Each structure stands twice: as C-alpha cells, then as structure tokens.
Amino acid sequence: WGLAGMRLGFAIGTEVTLAPSGPSMQDYLGPWAVAGPALTIGTRALSDDIWANGTRTRLAQDAARLDGLVTAKGGQLVGGTTLFRLYEVDDAAEWQSRLAQSHIWSRIFPYSKTWLRLGLPHPDRWTQLEAAL
C-alpha cells in the first residue's frame, strides 16, 4: 500500500500449502515482531474497500505517470510494482547523481550500470521530479 514506515506482511494459505517441506514460515520471519500500530493500521486498511480500491487506482495511475516521465527522457521500463519502478537508462550512476542534486533518492545496483529504481513521489513532489529529469 505504500504506507511509509509500516512493515506488515501476510502469508495466506491452507495447512497443506503452508506446511513446512523445507524452511518453516518462522524461519522466514526473523526476530522482528509486528508492532501494534502496524496491526491496527493494517486491519483498518484491509477492512476499508473504498480506501483500498482508491489506493490501488491511484498507485497504478502514479506508476504510469512515472513511466511516462522516465521513458520520455530515454529510460526503458524493466519491471517493478506500483510502488517502485525499475528502468534501464544509459548511465544509472549519472541519473542517480542528477536526481540526488534535486533531493530525489533512487537506487542503483552494483551488478548493472544501467538499472535505476525509483519510487513513486509524494503527490506534491511531481513537479520537483519533472524538473530533475
């Protein structure tokens, strides 16, 4: 959902599909407990169909908008989600440096000189991103 700072995940299945045939779910969880506020917010978010559908729609629209901005500057969409997008660009380090000068944080990868990952900007930061690109 892109709720900043909230870490909450789910594993949904039957006893058969979740039965450990290798590592158990507990092995994947690590030592981090789920915070009470995350449970409360997650419960509310999953119970509010109007909010959930509106959020899905907004995230999809924002991802398409970001794709349009980056591809107009020569980037090519490689993949991603509605929260993060992965692009192939000519020089990812140069793009990252240019974006950082405008306080826009991105991620590059040590195994690819051309991959750049961007998250969706806050609604009032689109102009800043457009200017940086």
Q: Over which residues does each language-model region extend?
A:
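PLP-dependent aminotransferase class I/II
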Residues: W1-V70, G75-L77
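Short amphipathic alpha-helical segments
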Residues: M6-R7, T81-L83, S112-L116
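Short loop segments at secondary-structure junctions
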Residues: G13-T17, V89-A92, P123
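Alpha-helix termini
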Residues: E15-L18, Y87, L116, A132
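Alpha-helix boundary/capping detector
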Residues: W51, G68, Q96, R125-W126
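Conserved PLP-binding catalytic core of the aspartate aminotransferase-like
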Residues: L59-A60, A64-S102, L120
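PLP-dependent enzyme catalytic core of the Aspartate aminotransferase-like
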Residues: S97, Q101, Y111-L133
